[in-house]
């Protein structure tokens, strides 16, 4: 680039450095910067630069108020300390309170904020203060067995509606939140929680307990197929013994437990018609089924029927005719008699002849009214042509 010499100046009076400076100013005048060009554009508004607020030194009263606020509200609740009307801070922000606490108590700040990577200042000389504590949170209170029972009772009453359970005054769980009740029910009763349709979390303790209970229940509960097979085998064995001894009669036990004793029901207050004593069963030959014991009211009803023989005047019922083809040995008498209910029959007539006086007599004049029958012509044998054929 060829150096430009301004007019009116000789090269003898200026050195090379002065010439270079003069050339730079001329180039800057010919090529203005972008900012200067943008300022000439209409509608351009330059953003105002951020003005930093002046640093105000902390007074002793402000420092004491900060420490008292940390004792009352806990370290970390800077906004609560700032909004507390008992303390006065001059144009301070929550970050200013945190920075001031880090400056005056770096060791305590490191204790409450172990992951802080900010600059730790040197401790300053401050008056003696009482021990500080971090902001208090809700303490975790373990569930008692009584609360678990009431929680389970509330689940039976309201179902998985944890808000209703917490608001139920009869259960006394108002100090527990709905989420606390849900989490406790999931941890204390995982099988009922899963049966209600909820999914268990990936907690190995709950899952192992739940599956262990299910495996124990499956082991103690007999299998349906094995029980059915055992019952079928028992029935087959009893049938085989009965087939081998067809003439053997079952032995009657002298004493059998009553059904009310098995169920542990007292029957001394019940009337006798509501149950049948089974200690000394009375077998009746007049029952419809052989070997069946009937209750007292049913026997009394059967005995109230009239005998079958008393329905006839002769005293003996008419015997049915026996066909010659039927042998005498083929008819087997019944080993028991059946009492039939009374039949309302009318007595038979004294004679088998009909009484003519009871029948209506026909009128002879009625037969004369019929017209006479037409007479048919008779043909002699001589007039028949086919008789003379030979």
Curated annotation (Swiss-Prot):
Highest rank taxon of the organism: Eukaryota
Domain called HTH myb-type: residue spans: 50-109, 135-193
Signal peptide: none
Main location: nucleus
Cross-referenced CDD domains: SANT_TRF
Any one GO cellular component localisation term in the record: nucleus
Subcellular location: Nucleus
Record SUPFAM superfamilies: Homeodomain-like
Keyword Chaperone: no
Disruption phenotype: Leads to lethality.
Annotated segments matching region Disordered: 30-57, 115-143, 244-278, 316-390
Example of a GO MF term: sequence-specific DNA binding
Compositional bias per record (Polar residues), positions renumbered to this chain: 244-257, 322-340
Basic and acidic residues bias (residue ranges): 32-48
DNA-binding region: 78-105, 162-189
PANTHER family recorded: TELOMERIC REPEAT-BINDING FACTOR 1, TELOMERIC REPEAT-BINDING FACTOR 1 TERF1
Name of this chain's protein: Telobox protein 1
